Amino acid sequence: MLISNEWLKEYVTIDDSVSNLAERITRTGIEVDDLIDYTKDIKNLVVGFVKSKDKHPDADKLNVCQVDIGEDEPVQIVCGAPNVDAGQYVIVAKVGGRLPGGIKIKRAKLRGERSEGMICSLQEIGISSNYIPKSFESGIYVFSESQVPGTDALQALYLDDQVMEFDLTPNRADALSMIGTAYEVAALYNTKMTKPDTTSNELELSANDELTVTIENEDKVPYYSARVVHDVTIEPSPIWMQARLIKAGIRPINNVVDISNYVLLEYGQPLHMFDQDAIGSQQIVVRQANEGEKMTTLDDTERELLTSDIVITNGQTPIALAGVMGGDFSEVKEQTSNIVIEGAIFDPVSIRHTSRRLNLRSESSSRFEKGIATEFVDEAVDRACYLLQTYANGKVLKDRVSSGELGAFITPIDITADKINRTIGFDLSQNDIVTIFNQLGFDTEINDDVITVLVPSRRKDITIKEDLIEEVARIYGYDDIPSTLPVFDKVTSGQLTDRQYKTRMVKEVLEGAGLDQAITYSLVSKEDATAFSMQQRQTIDLLMPMSEAHASLRQSLLPHLIEAASYNVARKNKDVKLFEIGNVFFANGEGELPDQVEYLSGILTGDYVVNQWQGKKETVDFYLAKGVVDRVSEKLNLEFSYRRADIDGLHPGRTAEILLENKVVGFIGELHPTLAADNDLKRTYVFELNFDALMSVSVGYINYQPIPRFPGMSRDIALEVDQNIPAADLLSTIHAHGGNILKDTLVFDVYQGEHLEKGKKSIAIRLNYLDTEETLTDERVSKVQAEIEAALIEQGAVIR
């Protein structure tokens, strides 16, 4: 935002330099990125009056002009501008003068004719061609009003000024207007802010007799109003208004369009002006666009609309794309006589989506996207009516045609002086605090020690007590607050939360098992968005992704972990063991926030233990990966169970779901050979757990038991079973009949091949028995073992 000091003085008067003002504003939270001085590098620039113009005798494109510059005699200046003519008031750089770019003006002879100065264009005095009125793009600037020759040209152009360039954070949308900035400056200097005149002399004719307004969806358009002005005269706007627009980075067009832009900058409220006679009806209907509906915007581009777009229509045809750009056939033209002025509040999200999709970013859309101050909507329209009456000879119809509700102008927030003082560490009286709020333009109500601050709608960044505390500290002055030690009502020792503690334990376990922690992108390709997803819900896609590889939010951590493993293997790091704790995302219904769930995932490939002098290497397999998962469950004092499963992307015979309290909380398995080959990986094992689900289980206290004083006993059993029977089913049967002396079991061998029928496999299981109260006898163990074997035989197993 570019803030002209000359313009700012219209609302607030301060006795300070612009550089000091910029420094003070920066110290209170709004960064002044640059200070533009239009008088810099300019010297001896005056207003001149062209008394006569004659063709140069030796150059067709040059003219010899006699110019009155306020001295005893006119000076002769040779000028090549095509639009120079007698009777014009122009900008003249006198001999001895200086222009931007180090240009010095000297007496010269041009093709034999003396020239004592230079008639200047706006570009030559430092104005960007982007902001110069089109009528002066290729020639000198000509004043539209009479001037006094010899007076300071910069003053006549309202360019003897310095402009502050604000680098605003998104929360300070109030400073995107001159009035919002004036409130800030008035607060800093404890002075009054004067608002501009908005009162018009209205006709007896009512706008309600000529126009109706209807809103079809007030969720998208809470409020829409219109006023009507008749008999406007289209002509250039006054010099002072053009200068203010140029200094704000906007090109002047004509008085009607310029007034619309002027009020936008003044109030931060975007307006749109329609040619009333071109609308084609006496009704304005604001609705969402029909799918595939088309309209041509002011830039002569035909746009295809979506139902998410908001359009202003004449009851049938769109005449404007709400908050973004007007339509071509209702625009203000040179012949326009009657004007309809729009002031509205549109849904910020809808405007943002439309402007980004169509790549139509403008001063108006950026303000609608940040939210509009309800207190200024009608006031800005009234200001435009006043300016049209004053500078376009307009006749303002009485009454406002509107639909919807503006909403609250203020938001009350209660706070106490004690709360403020405890936070900033400095004692201010209640009266001092109220004074600061009043300086900001906030009304207050006091009830004992409670201050109710009535925050105006222009300050959308203030919603909670802490925001008010920040305002007090800002306006009082951060540099003026003394350094103090913080005061605490209650001092407690710092400690980790239960979740933080458990998370650290899990990381330590996994790192101790040889895994390295990875952190990967939350964004994946649309194809990978649902890969390995445990919920298979609708994906969350970006509207404008930077690349196809980062187009959707992930539903699993594994796609990027597989990519990381492949990346490492391709660079000769063939033994990869990674884990990640991160968020995945699942969409809910339209308009609802998605679910964000924390997952724990891992990937292992290559050798787990490399071949060393003291032992042989150990290659990663299913049981090793399962052992890593079991370490996690043991550390968290949880008991996992496993159930065979078929999961896309994993080996159909080497995959299991992980259950906790009979609920699926994850899975483990070998990466499908095809997928592994696509990523140049050998046998690779992965696991994924719903970490939130693990954290939500209450495990109570860990009970410690003494080391057994009596010896245990082990028995091995080999079972021939159908190859499709999971070992887990056999273990379940064993534990069901093992009584209280069977402590644990271990599958230590699985065999398929010679000496076995086709479709059969042999599973060897070790059974460990223990009685903590007495020594086990062989007879007692044999009895339990026999019961187990009988149950297994009944299940279809053959004891080998």
Swiss-Prot record:
Subcellular location: Cytoplasm
Segments traversing the membrane: none
Residues of the B5 domain: 408-483
SMART domains hit by this protein: B3_4, B5, FDX-ACB
Keyword list, A-Z: Aminoacyl-tRNA synthetase, ATP-binding, Cytoplasm, Ligase, Magnesium, Metal-binding, Nucleotide-binding, Protein biosynthesis, RNA-binding, tRNA-binding
UniProt family annotation: Belongs to the phenylalanyl-tRNA synthetase beta subunit family. Type 1 subfamily.
GO CC annotation: phenylalanine-tRNA ligase complex
Alphabetized PROSITE patterns for the sequence: B5 (PS51483), FDX_ACB (PS51447), TRBD (PS50886)
Keyword Cell membrane attached: no
Gene3D superfamilies: 3.30.56.10, Bira Bifunctional Protein, Domain 2 (3.30.930.10), Ferrodoxin-fold anticodon-binding domain (3.30.70.380), Nucleic acid-binding proteins (2.40.50.140), Phenylalanyl-trna Synthetase, Chain B, domain 3 (3.50.40.10)
Chief localisation class: cytoplasm
Record domain FDX-ACB: where: 708-800
Complex formation: Tetramer of two alpha and two beta subunits.
Enzymatic reactions: tRNA(Phe) + L-phenylalanine + ATP = L-phenylalanyl-tRNA(Phe) + AMP + diphosphate + H(+)
Protein name: Phenylalanine--tRNA ligase beta subunit
Residues that hold Mg(2+) according to the record: D461, D467, E470, E471
Cofactor(s) essential for the protein: Mg(2+)
Domain tRNA-binding: 39-154
Gene Ontology molecular-function annotations: ATP binding; catalytic activity, acting on a protein; magnesium ion binding; phenylalanine-tRNA ligase activity; transferase activity; tRNA binding
InterPro entries with a match to the protein in the record: aa-tRNA-synth_II/BPL/LPL (IPR045864), B3/B4_tRNA-bd (IPR005146), DNA-bd_dom_put_sf (IPR009061), Fdx_antiC-bd (IPR005121), Fdx_antiC-bd_sf (IPR036690), NA-bd_OB-fold (IPR012340), Phe-tRNA-ligase_IIc_bsu (IPR045060), Phe-tRNA-ligase_IIc_bsu_bact (IPR004532)
EC nos: 6.1.1.20
Cofactor binding annotation: Binds 2 magnesium ions per tetramer.
Organism: Staphylococcus aureus (strain MSSA476)
One of the GO BP terms on file: phenylalanyl-tRNA aminoacylation
Keyword ATP-binding found: yes
